[in-house]
């Protein structure tokens, strides 16, 4: 018999962990570039009765009965995704960005085929051909990188493409702060007869707002997550505007039944909500502020003598290198965490440290902007971060941490996430 008990009543240990996480999110400043705060409407969709419904297949072609209403939900998400990004194909079923990427590879490649992707150590993603990932184990991965100035080396991409003759070139990143020339990538792909696959997960929100170039006119296939700058539920999305129906059929089959079974209908509903939110004028204003806040923070770090990789940012994130200071990313991450400022350690180009230690941090502005931070707030925050970083290993460290934590708590109270 169904028991309608609350988590607090039934599982107080779990409830305490949830409440403590709620408190942490309210009392800490979130600067992890891949994180964001969803609206209550998105959470409402994820907590709906749609979680009960199994719906293998696609709208109108299900393997289960009783799907007439979840068909409406999924079709809404599909139509809104197409409108948002200018696509003529959308698959909203991938459970994550990595699973979306796996589906693209499965649709267009065979095991052992060559892919050319961005080196993880230079800003790429695990699924772009890293040897520890399925993408580097199942496929023959060749990697391109960035120049000494921190910019994608398109000549390096072209030379390696001509040498390796990849079946697919992967463009996109997880830690690159400049604008990718999608047209140049397509030109190189066409020169060697390769597919161009773009993973726009980090900048999807900026693209939706028209503030970062859209890869859809250039790529054969595009994937994204639905969180990060898009500020929706954790999930994946596959898009295309290439007009090739055979590719679309292969993509659908690669998601289901090849890689996944039943879709998560409650998450797809939340994706539909987030796509509608991203179609509103307020969303563009939000993304514009994300850019302004990131740029404001960069200027402070540079003024305080820290190296910003590629010398700036044209999106929501930037990397700070501590090679010159002899500081590790792990130590910086931990120190900032003590002050209630959350970042992630990150490798920088030619990093002398191991990937779990690193010599840098990645900083992102989406979450603070959702709280209501403006450029002045962002600049002030960057100054506090520099104070903490400069105090590491010095006698005043504990004092700086305590003072910074107090200031963080004050601004978090002034600019709450949810306000209740």
UniProtKB/Swiss-Prot annotation:
Amino acids binding (6S)-5,6,7,8-tetrahydrofolate: 120, 124-126
Keyword list, A-Z: Amino-acid biosynthesis, Cytoplasm, One-carbon metabolism, Pyridoxal phosphate, Transferase
Enzyme Commission code: 2.1.2.1
Pfam families in the record: SHMT
Domain of life: Bacteria
Reaction equations catalysed: (6R)-5,10-methylene-5,6,7,8-tetrahydrofolate + glycine + H2O = (6S)-5,6,7,8-tetrahydrofolate + L-serine
Cofactor list: pyridoxal 5'-phosphate
Keyword Amino-acid biosynthesis appears in the UniProt entry: yes
Name of the protein: Serine hydroxymethyltransferase
